[in-house]
Amino acid sequence: MASIIKRKKSYSVVYNYVDENGETKQKWETWHTHKEALKRKAEVENQQNNGTFLPPNNQKVSDFLYDFVSTYGEKKWGVSMYDGQTALIANYINPIIGDMEVQDITPRVVDKYIQTLQKTPSVSKKNRKARTEFVTNQTIEKIIKLLRCAFKQAVRWELIGKNPFDNAVLPKTEYKKRDIWDAETIRLALDQCTDSKLYIAMNLAFACSLRMGEILGLTWKNVHIEDENIAADNAYIYIEAELTRASKQAIEMLGQKDIYYIFTPLMPNTSTRLILKKPKTDSSVRKVWLPKTVAYILREWKKSQEELKGFLGDEYQDFDLVVALPNGRPCENRIIEKEFSLLKQKAGLPNVVFHSLRHSSTTYKLKLNHGDLKATQGDTGHAEIDMITKVYAHILDEDRKINAQKFESAFYANPDLRKLTPPQEQPQAQTVDLAALIEQLQKSPELASTLAALIAGQKAV
């Protein structure tokens, strides 16, 4: 049985339990209101009676998350996910609730934690300034999603009875509409581009809807631009890898799962490594057909690359990469982004990020194929088709307007339907104002005599 003891402005629920060593212990739990204490008392008694009571556990959140990462994370995460999730834990979870006990995390604590996060300064990434002053709502959503997953395991491991993050109320996230270039601006940018690597990358991003990592991880063995392919409109690329940077810790923890190649670093003491890895989702592994012009551009680029190989000889490090540095080594995204910024400045183009070319591609394709979501999804590699409908709904709305216009011309413009005219309104009968008529007759005896003569004439007829 449990009891409630009032302590100044709070209430304690006191009960005995048997720990994992078989010893009887007493537990005091503090609650702010009598109503909360009564609810907890009933909960404890009910669980003890039906055998579902979990003994108190003093494990701290930080220790629990360490166990969670080393058991769950190692099995479920790739290296990029591992780095991202452990960064959230180190920057925004452990500093705030890491010293709390797992069993002390209640829905009320979760609500206060979210409020604290909204006032927490953003942590800068290495060599990069934070984009916002405080933690964004999008980041808070990622943090709570991670904790919801972690505490689901805590329930499974019988550390807690229920997940306090299940019904967490998140701050509203407003997704800003991305600025993108239209087709004419992209054409102008390509005309002004003088950097060969950037030129290839821009064409692949726009024509093939590729992500940056997919462009930089593309190898020549997956580029099919032979004469017979082009003649049959069957030139294509196959996306099966992406270039990214991962921490040595993630690689050591997870092994080489989903990693195709680890590039030898130029400076061996760095804490990260460039790797070629499998894309995050199965839908990202895909075949994308090439416009003929892009196929010819790639052929010319390969020819110039082969000439460079012959000139450099053994100095060229051949990793079979399509977009590579002059010595053959992988080209990181920061190099492309820097050249892209220089191009925008030189050509006086609107300021967009390189990734926006992928959004321009999706927008352009949806217009060309009149909203064919499945075909567009095949090129973009989105895991869920809903991701396209949410982001590009305005394009689909334009096509829906066109649908109404087509419906009008195809159906309602039929001459037979035009014969169905709407009913005409019947003219209303004129009414006589008797009071005004009597007044006029009194003022004009001549009018009264004329009217009397007319009435007599009508009767005679």
Regions found by a protein language model. Name each.
Residues 3, 17, 70-157, 175, ...:
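N-terminal core-binding DNA-recognition domain of tyrosine site-specific recombinases/integrases
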Residues 7-111, 303-317, 397, 412, ...:
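N-terminal DNA-binding module of tyrosine recombinases/phage integrases
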Residues 17, 266-275, 281-349:
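Active-site/catalytic core of tyrosine-dependent DNA strand-transfer enzymes
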Residues 123, 130-137, 141-143, 156, ...:
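Basic, Lys/Arg- and aromatic-enriched nucleic-acid-binding interface segment
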Residues 156, 203, 207, 214, ...:
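C-terminal catalytic core of tyrosine-transesterase DNA break-rejoin enzymes
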Residues 172-173, 180, 231, 241-245, ...:
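Catalytic-site neighborhood detector that most strongly recognizes the C-terminal catalytic loop/helix
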Residues 222-231, 332, 350-351, 370-393:
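Short, polar N-cap/turn motifs at the start of nucleic acid-interacting alpha helices
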Residues 225-236, 241-285, 294, 405-461:
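C-terminal secondary-structure termini that scaffold catalytic or DNA-interacting sites
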